[in-house]
Amino acid sequence: MEPKARCSDSQRGGPCTNHEPPALEEGGRRHRRARAGSSSGALGLQLRPRVRPQRRAAAAAAAAAAAAAAATAASAAASAILGGRAAAAQPIGHPDALERAARANLRARRGDAWRGRGAPQRRAPAEARALGAASRALARRGAAPAAPLRGQPGPALPPPGPEAEPALPGGGQLAVAGPAAPEAPGLGLGGGLDPVRPRGGGRTRGHPRGAGPGVRRGGLLGRGNLPHIGGGHIPLGLVFLVQPAAGGRALLLDQPAVAG
């Protein structure tokens, strides 16, 4: 009986890490990594299905067509709801537009962390800069009333007449943010604008026990839900579709062009 083939590891007295037991080998010299590449044992057949390029292209085309159809339906719904005003404006059909803006604001604040402890307070966030630009553009055109402070109601809107906008599907309501917004605590709209305040809190900012005075967690826009759009923490002239059936998420429908 011939001696079994032994590798260098087993000759030193350690376990054999490079070869399988001789009963499972072919001649005692087959490498373990050669068996690991085949998924069906000794046959070496690959059981993973290969993706056909035609099917991949067809799936991509179907996804693009579905996205285009959804965008068309959203723009048509916005035009029907706003009475054609969305056609001359800049529609934003993405339902998470508020959340994306809040995340961009958070990234801008985090980018200033290397400047020091008080840098996020000295530099205005992206929403505040956009709000200031919109207010100055409207003031140059003579169409911006004086923005009241927080807690003071904005100018009252006239009662709806017979030419009121039709009821929205799903029991939604239109909400216009800015100085002309009515007092609607049920919708989370406080009316008027809120001046930009320092966040405070220092290094523990963002923690529920470490937040200092004047802190609004989550940025100026919050996460896009109803409790976070109250008090006028959003730029002027934004039109939202508030859908209670969708968990109270506010859908940004219309953003007028305010650049002078």
From Swiss-Prot:
GO cellular component: extracellular space; nucleolus
Secretion signal span: none
UniProt keyword Ion transport present: no
Cysteines joined through disulfide linkages: none
Biased composition (Gly residues): 187-199, 209-219
Post-translational modification as stated in the protein's UniProt record: Undergoes proteolytic cleavage to produce a secreted C-terminal fragment.
Record keywords: Nucleus, Secreted
Compositional bias of kind Low complexity: 36-48, 116-154, 164-186
Annotated region described as Required for nucleolar localization, given as residue ranges: 104-130
DNA repair recorded as keyword: no
Ranges annotated as spanning the membrane: none
Segments for region (Disordered): 1-50, 108-219
Subunit and partners: Interacts with C1QBP; the interaction results in nucleolar localization of C1QBP, probably due to prevention of C1QBP maturation and redirection from mitochondria to nucleoli.
Full protein name: POLG alternative reading frame
Organism: Homo sapiens (Human)
